[in-house]
Amino acid sequence: TTSYSWVNDTPSIGLASSGNGNIESLTVSNSGNTPVVATVIVTPTFENEGIACQGDSQTFTITVNPSSQVDEVDNQVLCNGDDSDEINFTTSNTSGTTTYSWVNDTPSIGLASSGTGDIASFAAVNNSTSPVTATITVTPTYTNEGISCDGPTETFTITVNPTAQVDDPQDQIICNGETTSVEFTTQNTGGTTTYAWANDTPSIGLAD
């Protein structure tokens, strides 16, 4: 009969520091941002007729990759027609390769519905009269030693405000000495619209 004993130099991965027999299924753990490598040494013992003979040990490793991670991304608020800021994804993961895939729930803003890697600057689009907010969800994937591990997603928003609009005021004809006022209105909603004006004939009593 051959039996086996083993020792593990890194029990933090979720495997005991030593044991006998086969290593049963276990849930591994790595709370850091770099791979953790555990070295396991297994020693066989052959027993027959009450005599035990120990054999040469064999060594193997269990590498536990960290969870893939992407740093928080700042939200953006843009005007219709503005160029967005380029978005360069970053991570605290090390000793491997982290790639990024993303989906955008509102491609009408001028950004594709999905993609991979960083997001280049694009011309923001909003032809409506109220703000449009797109939510972008990023999934990081960490690859090391040929094994890829997806991590928690990160979301951020890009809000595109509409072009400011003012309704066409009616021309006025009034008598000398009379008073009048003009109230500006807009079709814009979801924000605040302010108005600046200039008058080419201040002699009528209206500032320039």
Regions found by a protein language model. Name each.
Residues 1-208:
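Extracellular low-complexity Ser/Thr/Asn/Gly-rich intrinsically disordered segments
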